[in-house]
A protein has these predicted regions:
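N-terminal regions of ATP-driven nucleic-acid and macromolecular assemblies
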Residues: 1, 29, 128-132, 172
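N-terminal accessory targeting/assembly segments
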Residues: 1-93
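P-loop NTP-binding catalytic core
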Residues: 65-67, 71, 77-143
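Hydrophobic anchor at the beta1->P-loop junction of P-loop NTPases
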Residues: 146-148
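The conserved Walker
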Residues: 152
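Conserved lysine of the Walker
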Residues: 156
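Hydrophobic positions on the alpha1 helix immediately C-terminal to the Walker A/P-loop
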Residues: 159, 163
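Post-Walker A helix-loop "phosphate-sensing" segment adjacent to the P-loop in P-loop NTPases
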Residues: 165-173
Length: 173
């Protein structure tokens, strides 16, 4: 049976090692996947709106986690130090690779991450029309300022991207 390939999913999976990317390319329901989760010593898992489910694949190794981060950072992890201090690397297409490990500190300041224990690949997707949620507050004129608050995974970035697209489509820059 042929698996329907989802463009956003495939683009995000581009930072994975080739063998793991090939395994996950065969996953059905790619268009529903919100996150790919990789934890050392456990098989990968996928998160959809219906919840998380483990995949029947080989367990993730610490070396594989390091390779995923290295590939996501285009083999230049040091150039992503500022981003890694915040716990993630932004990928082409707006996808984000969250990292979990031990903070490396110098003089009381976080300077990087070591001992990766897991990575989480969040897949960015376009969501047409969600800007209508905030339209009553921003109106047609110049927007003032706004603060978007919600737990992780509730669509703050999606809402903001769609709002910027909608404002841009109306000719505002």
């Amino acid at each position: 049976m042929e698996v329907k390939q989802d463009k956003a999913y495939q683009q995000a999976a581009g930072c994975l090692p080739p063998l793991r990317a090939a395994q996950l390319a065969a996953l059905e329901g790619q268009e529903e996947v919100e996150e790919l989760r990789f934890r050392a010593g456990r098989p990968p898992a996928v998160k959809t709106a219906r919840g998380e489910r483990g995949l029947e694949l080989a367990v993730v190794t610490a070396q594989e986690l390091r390779e995923i981060l290295s590939r996501a950072a285009r083999y230049s992890v040091h150039s992503y130090t500022e981003s890694l201090k915040n716990g993630f690397v932004t990928l082409t297409g707006g996808h984000r690779l969250g990292v979990c490990g031990t903070a490396a500190e110098e003089n009381g300041k976080v300077v990087g991450i070591r001992g990766l224990s897991s990575v989480n690949l969040r897949i960015a997707r376009q969501a047409w029309g969600v800007d209508a949620v905030i339209a009553p507050w921003v109106g047609e004129g110049e927007p003032q300022s706004m603060l978007l608050l919600s737990p992780p995974g509730f669509g703050k970035t999606t809402l903001l991207r769609e709002w910027v697209r909608a404002v841009s489509d109306k000719g505002h820059t």
